[in-house]
Each structure stands twice: as C-alpha cells, then as structure tokens.
Amino acid sequence: MFRILIIDPNTPFRESLRKIINNRFPTIEIQEAAAADEGLRKLNTFTPLLIFIDIYLPDKNGLDLAKKIKASHPEIIIAIFTRYDSPEYQTAANDSGVENLIPKDDWSGEDILALVESIFSDADINRSVKMDSK
C-alpha cells in the first residue's frame, strides 16, 4: 500500500492537498499532521513513501525536520512547500535530503499529481523488480 504524510499547519491546505491526491489515487493512504512533533509521532506507526512538509511549522523549520526524518528513514522521499527559490536555498534543501522543492505560491494540482504518479510508479517498478529477482 502506498502512503503519504502531509505536515502543514494550514488545515484547509492539508485537506485540499489530500482531496486532490485521493481524487486521482483513491487507494493511497494519506495521514496529516499540523506540526513537526505530531508528524514525527505518526512516523512511529505510519511509514509513508512520500512526505510533504511546509517550510514554516509552528515547532520546527521544515528543513530541520526533513534532515531529522532522513536520518532515521533515508528511503522516504521528501517534498518541501516553500516561498524561497534562491540557489542557496536549493543547496540547503539538498543538504537536508529534500528531493523536491515546490513553490507554495505557484503550485497546481496537476503538478502535485504528476509528482505523486512519478514517485509511486517508480516505487511500483522497483518493487516488481525486487519480487522478480527472488
């Protein structure tokens, strides 16, 4: 089963993102968290393939959270919603283990769906290859 965790303090944003993804991919299990600590607690019982994180969280910077998650779950893909797009920020995101930066002011549902489809299709292919090699 494919899973996504959305960590963002904005409830309407989380709900909108969940709805967009579930309308196209109804079998993906999605959980939400409003803060970093809540998201980290969810990782104790819920292991997603993809995590969307807002750069601004009430209790931790999104890049710091990404780095912490990558330290214990290097296989999880992380996408950060941000308003920053400078090369320095891209470098900081890469250093934190972030695979995708998404402009918070300029994202579309289709962009998110294309990202999700790409990630989960690659995961499905990798899982098939592993099963075939056994």
Residue ranges and their predicted role:
Residues 11-31:
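Two-component/phosphorelay signaling modules centered on CheY-like receiver
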Residues 32-50:
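Acidic, metal-coordinating helix/loop segments flanking the phosphotransfer/catalytic sites
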Residues 35, 61-64:
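Acidic catalytic/metal-coordinating carboxylates
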Residues 75-85:
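A short, hydrophobic beta-strand element within the central beta-sheet of small alpha/beta folds
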Residues 93-100:
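As written
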